[in-house]
From Swiss-Prot:
It catalyses: aldehydo-D-ribose 5-phosphate = D-ribulose 5-phosphate. The keyword Isomerase applies. This is Ribose-5-phosphate isomerase A. NCBIfam families: PRK00702.1, rpiA. InterPro entries: NagB/RpiA_transferase-like, Ribose5P_isomerase_typA_subgr, Ribose5P_isomerase_type_A. Belongs to the ribose 5-phosphate isomerase family. It is an enzyme of class 5 (isomerase). Catalyzes the reversible conversion of ribose-5-phosphate to ribulose 5-phosphate. GO terms for biological process: D-ribose metabolic process; pentose-phosphate shunt, non-oxidative branch. GO terms for molecular function: ribose-5-phosphate isomerase activity. It holds the Pfam family Rib_5-P_isom_A. The active site is at 107 (proton acceptor).
């Protein structure tokens, strides 16, 4: 299968999971990116089962609304039974690198309040050790250089994310992103806590303290379900 076909496969599998496990009238948390878009497209047929969705980005909001979903403010929600999102990398503990699409902060906020985090990905995203994919850090613009120096001290190579026009990429929150290359992340939870404590960091794209509960992994032979122990 092509990567696009695998994304469609896991998008449908996630919609099937949500329809089977989430009560009618619930609100669904939805991530950002091409794989999350496949989930939105697949869930659209059953959208009347749900009160609405909480979106992790302006792009996801537009996609949801194009299918007729009501998009709700997270501040209006008492509970969020499930959050579905893709990953740039995921390891065998359920820790992830996310933020390739630039929505890491809102993704982390929505994931943090969800009861179940369902990661949807193709098999190429499952890795033994995180770090081959550059690690995004959302930063307040005035702290970009100082955070870059801290990244270098860790052994990473900081690269300011730019648009195709060559200007800094700006997140939905008005911040910039540093992509860190060259890290081998053997202890993602500790690194997440460490980087998040740097002045000027909004959040780092490590999802380890609140990782995935299960992963629907697309392979050439179908969808594998991986459940992660949080004990």
């Amino acid at each position: 299968m092509t990567q696009d076909e695998l994304k469609q496969l896991v998008g449908q599998a996630a919609a099937d999971y949500v329809n089977a496990n989430v009560p009618e009238g619930s609100v669904i948390g939805v991530g950002t990116g091409s794989t999350a878009n496949c989930f939105i497209d697949a869930l659209a047929a059953g959208k009347t089962r749900y009160r609405g969705a909480v979106s992790s980005s302006l792009a996801t909001t537009a996609r949801l609304q194009s299918h007729g979903f009501k998009v709700l403010d997270l501040n209006e929600i008492d509970s969020l039974p499930v959050y579905v999102d893709g990953a740039d990398e995921i390891d065998h503990s359920g820790a992830m690198i996310k933020g390739g699409g630039g929505a890491l902060t809102r993704e982390k906020i929505v994931a943090s309040v969800s009861d179940v985090f369902v990661c949807i990905a193709d098999a190429s995203k499952l890795v033994e050790t995180l770090g081959s994919f550059p690690l995004p850090i959302e930063v307040v613009p005035m702290a970009r250089t100082s955070i870059g120096r801290r990244v270098t001290a860790l052994g990473g190579v900081p690269v300011v994310r730019v648009t195709k026009e060559g200007v800094p990429f700006i997140t939905d929150n008005g911040n910039e992103i540093i992509d860190v290359k060259g890290l081998r992340i053997s202890d993602p939870r500790t690194l997440e806590t460490h980087v998040n404590a740097w002045p000027g960091v909004v959040t780092v794209g490590l999802f380890a303290s609140r990782g995935a509960d299960l992963c629907l992994l697309g392979t050439d032979t179908g969808v594998d379900t991986i459940r992660f122990s949080k004990g």
